[in-house]
Curated annotation (Swiss-Prot):
InterPro entries the UniProt entry points to: UDP_glucos_trans, UDP_glycos_trans_CS
Name by which UniProt lists this protein: UDP-glycosyltransferase 74E1
EC main group: transferase
Molecular function (Gene Ontology), one example: UDP-glucosyltransferase activity
Gene3D superfamilies: Glycogen Phosphorylase B
Keyword entries, A-Z: Glycosyltransferase, Transferase
EC number, as in UniProt: 2.4.1.-
Domain of life: Eukaryota
Binding site for UDP-alpha-D-glucose: 279, 332-334, 349-357, 371-374
Length: 453
């Protein structure tokens, strides 16, 4: 390995961004590249563990003291994060150079495009990392270029636009930040600005794989120097080449592994409905009650992740009433759960990490998207990849229990479910092939490593 075979990786400070980028670090480390993973946090020692001696985890303050209450104003919060990184990252780079371990590239989260100028000002290559799929980034790009007008309603069903290599999209298929721009002005600006300087970026990385977005990728690659490196699911669930890569190594939440697995072990194959909406989605009380009723009425066993902050919304005596039919937990070991033989389908918010896990592990899905890129992911999950169905909300954006029961029956019992399971298995194989030796993502990771080794 030559001097300077070293890159810095800097994710946005949210678990949904840290997880795929830290997984990418493991793949790079397995190919003898030195990595400094910079985690922005208010803690002096972020709770991330790695078995790789070539991955060094370095914390950078987010501008807040540990335990200090963060501002609810996103503009203020991100200004402090940006200021803190700009003040501390240059010294970190200089110290690395003085220590004889100079970095040659900065891999940074797409939501922080200003880091490209920091990289270039210190002679580093700038590699932007998109934690969302191209199907979403392409939409944001057209908004940025002014070729698509932001609609004003979320629940309208009129056709709005057709993008290159994408299916026709309705209002309820678009990222929520576009349809509710007045509700999320800062976030809308952030997601659009991801593309603001992409034409100057040296390398474009994305947590997807070539076969998954094949048609769209032909157009994308004609515009930018793209390397798809996903799915960033731990190796032991895919190609099994990295024996130590059994989990994500980073979690903000405790997982009650034994409780979940013992309960699942007592169930028949493909008999359990697994329900999890990630770490950020908050259901209104009426919606949570409706979902609870739907799960109960479906007649199937179910494992439902209900965070502690949400449990007070459950119907009175619900836990006692469902008995052995259902298990509610505050968090679950999702990868272990999804690969358990008892799981029949995955009810998901369609966040990209969860969607990619479902695809990679061959699990049929029921999409119940809420915001961000979730509606667009759900559209592709149902209509393009055909690995699940999407619940339909009413005119008020409310999903009724009857609709939920109907969708569970489609996936778990109906003929449609057989075709969905067949497609899910197909994508599982393709995901494994992508990261296996000689696969498209493996080749792309090798190409990236060759630039700096």
């Amino acid at each position: 390995m030559r001097e300077g075979s070293h890159v810095i990786v800097l994710p946005f400070p949210a678990q949904g961004h840290i997880t795929p980028m830290s997984q990418f670090c493991k793949r790079l480390a397995s190919k003898s590249l030195k990595i400094t993973l910079v985690l922005v946090s208010d803690k002096p020692s972020p709770p991330y563990k790695t078995e790789h001696d070539t991955i060094t985890v370095v914390p950078i303050s987010n501008g807040f003291q540990e335990g200090q209450e963060r501002s609810e104003d996103l503009d203020e919060y991100m200004e402090r994060v940006e200021s803190s990184i700009k003040n501390r990252l240059p010294k970190l780079i200089e110290d690395m150079k003085l220590s004889g371990n100079p970095p040659r590239a900065l891999v940074y989260d797409s939501t922080m495009p200003w880091l490209l100028d920091v990289a270039h000002s210190y002679g580093l290559s700038g590699a932007v990392f998109f934690t969302q799929p191209w199907l979403v980034s392409a939409i944001y790009y057209h908004v940025f270029k002014g070729s698509f007008s932001v609609p004003s309603t979320k629940y309208g069903h009129s056709t709005l636009a057709s993008f290159p290599s994408l299916p026709i999209l309705n209002a309820n298929d678009l990222p929520s930040f576009l349809c509710e721009s007045s509700s999320y002005p800062y976030i809308l600006r952030t997601v659009i600005d991801q593309l603001s300087n992409i034409d100057r970026v040296d390398i474009v990385l994305c947590n997807t794989f070539d076969k998954l977005e094949e048609k769209l990728l032909k157009w994308i690659k004609s515009v930018w120097p793209v390397l798809n490196i996903g799915p960033t699911v731990p190796s032991m669930y895919l190609d099994k080449r990295l024996a130590e890569d059994k989990n994500y190594g980073f979690s903000l939440f405790g997982a009650k592994i034994a409780e979940c697995m013992e309960w699942l072990n007592s169930k028949q194959p493909s008999s359990v409905v697994y329900v999890s909406f990630g770490s950020l989605v908050v259901l209104k009380k009426d919606q949570l009650i409706e979902l609870a009723a739907g799960l109960k009425q479906s007649g199937h066993f179910f494992l439902w992740v209900v965070r502690e902050t949400e449990r007070r919304k459950l119907p009175e005596n619900y836990i006692e009433e469902i008995g052995e039919k259902g298990l509610t937990v505050s968090w679950s070991p999702q990868l272990e759960v999804l690969t358990h033989k008892s799981i029949g389908c995955f009810v998901t918010h369609c966040g990209w990490n969860s969607t990619l896990e479902g695809l990679s592990l061959g699990v049929p899905m029921i999409g119940m998207p809420h915001w961000a890129d979730q509606p667009t992911n759900a559209k592709f999950m149902e209509d393009v990849w055909k690995v699940g169905v999407r619940v339909k909300a009413d005119s008020d954006g409310f999903v009724r229990r009857e609709e939920f029961v109907r969708r569970v029956e489609e996936v778990m019992e109906a003929e449609q479910g057989k075709e969905i399971r067949k497609n899910a298995e197909k994508w599982k194989v393709l995901a494994q092939e992508a990261v296996s030796e000689g696969g498209s993502s493996d080749k792309n990771i090798n190409e990236f490593v060759s630039m700096f080794c």
